Design a protein with these regions (language model features):
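Metalloprotease/metallohydrolase-associated module, dominated by Zn2+-dependent proteases
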Residues: 2-48, 52-72, 82, 99-181
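Active-site recognition of the HExxH zinc-binding catalytic motif
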Residues: 86-98
């Protein structure tokens, strides 16, 4: 007997996500830069081992699992090539931070810093923002991610983001700049 409609839909979403990941690995300069930086920093990156597409809670788009050193792309919520590329880039920044900066994600200041960097180097980077709008995007994305991960309100998350913002916002490694590539 074949799978149910939901099983078939889930399999199709996972397959489409995997195709989008392959496209990003082949064509996105930002993704290539992050992967090359991981490899050259002594953090071997093997896509089949370090990236997984899977269904997630509807509130999520992806995540970085430091226990398994794996990026998760949510196949049920990331349905376009551009969204997969954005989330993959964002999560690769976390992977880079974990490997090269020895970030401990259960430390709130480490998490806030990595979320600021991921927003600055990936999530907010596709658009030519003016300075204020870009900074606002980074703070808003980082606070949103913190609120989801820590299950806290935006005000509490914003407090943690503001505490480490300047130092983390100005750390541009390994991309080297903000904005489009």
């Amino acid at each position: 007997m074949s799978g149910t409609y939901l099983d078939i839909k889930m399999d199709r979403e996972i397959s489409q996500c995997e195709i989008s990941v392959i496209k990003a690995l082949r064509s996105s300069l930002r993704v290539k830069t992050l992967v090359n930086a991981l490899n050259s920093s002594g953090c071997p990156f093997v896509p089949d081992r370090h990236i997984a597409c899977a269904p997630c809670d509807q509130a999520l788009s992806g995540g970085y699992d430091d226990t398994h050193n794996q990026v998760i792309i949510c196949s049920n919520t990331c349905k376009s090539d551009s969204k997969v590329e954005e989330i993959l880039s964002h999560e690769l920044v976390h992977m880079f931070d974990y490997c090269t900066k020895k970030v401990t994600f259960d430390r709130i200041d480490h998490l806030a810093c990595s979320e600021i960097r991921a927003a600055s180097l990936a999530s907010c980077a596709k658009v030519n923002w003016n300075y204020w709008s870009f900074e606002h995007c980074v703070k808003a994305k980082a606070a949103h991610s913190m609120a989801v991960i820590e299950n806290c309100d935006r005000k509490e998350a914003k407090k943690h983001v503001d505490k480490v913002f300047d130092k983390c916002y100005n750390d541009l490694e390994p991309i080297g700049h903000r904005g489009p590539m």
